[in-house]
Regions:
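Conserved active-site and SAM-binding loop architecture
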Residues: 1-240
Length: 240
């Protein structure tokens, strides 16, 4: 079980059904992604199975842990990408990757300059209710979240998930909850425009009645996906 946007996820049949579909269709390249937790603890057994199933499907498989904040996304968000190329095509790019493996070479190193919240902050979001406003009024510069103010007011522990956004810092991972990332400067939630910027969604995106926080918090940023796809095209597909 893994977590993305504070929602538990289980890697089960849909992921492996996707690999089975790739086996049937045999596209030149297959790209899949999942949460960082996939590489931790016992979950690594799933990674081994993913590699085996892609191998059986006729693909070389590699995985990369990528940070969106280094890819032109104003958000620190880690995702695991599985980048696979069909055996008959991958032989054109084989390179020794370590002492034991030969893999089709592709660089997934990114070092784009970070984009801080202050570059697009508009403070046009919904104002806080009474309880959130009270904790906001008891904040201290340097607070990471609302937990210090909550402890000051109640003597209890809590509100660790309401993380402050400073103008000179990059946003932490945006989750599906509207209070997961909140401006330190003003007592308002993030506006729709700010949420779209943080997740690199179009400003005119139609959320079809769903919360922008929910959709963006549960999605891989489009610019992050575009960066991976561009590398695949430039280093593999354009050379075939």
């Amino acid at each position: 079980m893994f977590r993305e946007g504070q929602t538990a996820q289980v890697l089960d049949t849909p992921f492996f059904d996707f690999i089975a579909l790739a086996k049937a269709l045999q596209p030149k390249v297959v790209i899949a992604e999942n949460v960082k937790g996939l590489l931790m603890g016992n979950a690594i057994d799933y990674v081994r199975r993913i590699y085996k199933d892609f191998e059986d499907a006729g693909y070389y498989c590699q995985h990369f842990l990528l940070d969106a904040s280094k890819m032109g996304v104003p958000q620190m968000r880690n995702r695991v990408f599985f980048v696979c190329i069909r055996h008959d095509l991958g032989v054109n790019f084989l390179k020794v990757s370590d002492l034991f493996n030969v893999e089709p070479h592709i660089s997934m190193d990114f070092n784009e300059p970070g984009i801080c919240y202050g570059e697009f902050a508009d403070y046009m979001g919904k104002p806080y209710g009474k309880r959130m406003k009270e904790m906001f009024d008891n904040r201290t510069h340097g607070d990471i979240d609302m937990s210090n103010a909550y402890r000051k007011l109640t003597g209890k522990r809590g509100f660790f998930n309401q993380c402050y956004l400073y103008e000179d810092e990059i946003c932490n991972t945006l989750t599906a909850h509207s209070d997961s990332a909140i401006p330190f400067k003003k007592p308002v939630y993030l506006s729709t425009a700010e949420v779209c910027n943080i997740s690199t969604f179009p400003q005119d995106y139609d959320f079809c009645g769903f919360s922008p926080h929910y959709i963006c918090g549960m999605s891989v940023p489009p610019v992050m996906m575009a960066q991976v796809a561009t590398r695949v095209y430039e280093q593999w597909l354009s050379k075939l």
